[in-house]
Amino acid sequence: MVEDHARGVEDDEDLGVLARARLAAAVDRGECDFALDVASRIPMITICDLLGVPSQDQEYMLSLTKSAISSDDQPEYSAAADSARNDILQYFLGMVEERRATPQEDVVSALAGSTIDGEFLSEDEIVLNCYSLILGGDATARLTMIDSVHSFSTNPDQWAAFKRGDVSVKQATEEVLRWASPTMHFGRTAVQDTEIHGTPIKAGDVVTVWNGSGNRDERVFADPDRFLIDRSPNKHIAFGHGPHYCIGAYLARLEISEVLLALRDFTTGFEIAGPVRRIYSNLLTGISSLPVRFEPVSAEVEELVL
């Protein structure tokens, strides 16, 4: 259901237009905080549009999702995280009630009208699905976009190869996902007794999968600690693996690739222009502030500035 709606974004070319317009405006200014001015906007606008969150509420929703699972400036636990999570749940509870009364062409309406074995999904089931979608639909793509600019800035040879067209945007997207690995870990419950590298695991034990470690596994990746955009094969686990593979992987890849294409088309290069700050989180890793100075390809940018 969600993937069908995501593919509709691609068909309408809305996402490409959004990414190019946001990047063009930033490049035209010459400098921006890429994390705040570009990467924070594209995934959130996209997932909010899919869910049916109106434009006037999207800035509010961005502030909630960022507070719910990470913090830009507080290393200690904050009650704001609990409050943000509760506010997200309450917001979608209100949306579910509205959509059941007046369905629209969005994911919340689709969930509200869905049945399993003839029974409609409960409000709790719909709200928790929306909660997962809004958080997952923002964080991975946003943090990977930010990391891609940082990684290209610190690996100019890789940027040059991408700018020349030596490497496809598809390959580059997979490598920035592997390199960024924004979701640090997943928990999995063993369904039977087993063993992992000599450690006995009993049925019912919870095993933590560390994505960053897996994506640097020297048995899988040659030169795992190098950012190489022509890496092939690239069997990373940025979106997890198996039955719990990220449902939003298709959309995240599309968002990241559109930003990379816009960077290639609108800039000859870019550099870090100030202190880089990282987020505080037990679940995610990434950058919260990335000041960037662009070298524009002027003619193309001027035509697309908002």
Identify the function of each model-found stretch.
Residues 1-306:
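Cytochrome P450
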